[in-house]
């Protein structure tokens, strides 16, 4: 397993997470190819992080899968914009950290799954119980 961390990217974490969810569990080569054609700004950064994680582990891109792609909130740059009548409004410029983990893909041999037969049991019908005062008075008399 190898990791890559890219810090303080000027990109909203919520926008980057939409892209990060798409590539989790994919082959690294397929993930980078699909990110190449995405129009989003975050796709370029996530593709760079995946290629960096592959290089950090010394793997080939076609032999690893993206185990996890996590986007965390980083520092928020705060700016002020002048508004009417001498007031000012705050502009938030969010940044994010991207962490990608890749794992070498293992070739799994096909395993035959045995299906267990379900045993059905029939339940006895429930007894009628009356617990009201009137019903118990009728039974006693």
UniProtKB/Swiss-Prot annotation:
UniProt-listed Gene3D superfamilies: Ribosomal protein L22/L17
Q: What Pfam families does its record include?
A: Ribosomal_L22
Q: Which GO terms describe its cellular component?
A: cytosolic large ribosomal subunit
Is Cell inner membrane among the key words of this record? no
Keyword terms: Ribonucleoprotein, Ribosomal protein, RNA-binding, rRNA-binding
Stretches for region Disordered: 110-141
Classification via CDD domains: Ribosomal_L22
Give residue spans, biased composition: Low complexity.
117-134
Q: What are the GO BP annotations of this UniProt entry?
A: translation
> One GO molecular function term?
structural constituent of ribosome
Q: What does this protein do?
A: This protein binds specifically to 23S rRNA; its binding is stimulated by other ribosomal proteins, e.g. L4, L17, and L20. It is important during the early stages of 50S assembly. It makes multiple contacts with different domains of the 23S rRNA in the assembled 50S subunit and ribosome. The globular domain of the protein is located near the polypeptide exit tunnel on the outside of the subunit, while an extended beta-hairpin is found that lines the wall of the exit tunnel in the center of the 70S ribosome.
Please give the family membership noted in the entry: Belongs to the universal ribosomal protein uL22 family.
Assembly, in brief, is: Part of the 50S ribosomal subunit.
Q: What name appears for this protein in its UniProt entry?
A: Large ribosomal subunit protein uL22
Q: What is the lineage of its organism?
A: Bacteria, Pseudomonadati, Campylobacterota, Epsilonproteobacteria, Campylobacterales
């Amino acid at each position: 397993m190898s990791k890559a961390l890219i810090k303080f990217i000027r990109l909203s974490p919520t926008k980057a997470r939409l892209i990060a969810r798409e590539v989790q569990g994919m082959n690294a080569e397929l993930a980078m190819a699909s990110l190449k054609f995405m129009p989003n700004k975050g796709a370029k950064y996530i593709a760079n992080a995946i290629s960096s994680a592959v290089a950090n582990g010394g793997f080939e891109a076609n032999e690893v899968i993206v185990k996890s792609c996590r986007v965390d909130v980083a520092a928020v740059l705060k700016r002020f914009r002048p508004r009417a009548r001498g007031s000012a409004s705050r502009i938030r410029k969010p940044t994010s950290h991207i962490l990608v983990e890749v794992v070498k893909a293992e070739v799994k041999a096909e395993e035959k799954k045995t299906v267990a037969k379900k045993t059905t049991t029939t339940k006895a019908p429930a007894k009628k119980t009356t617990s009201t005062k009137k019903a118990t008075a009728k039974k006693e008399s």
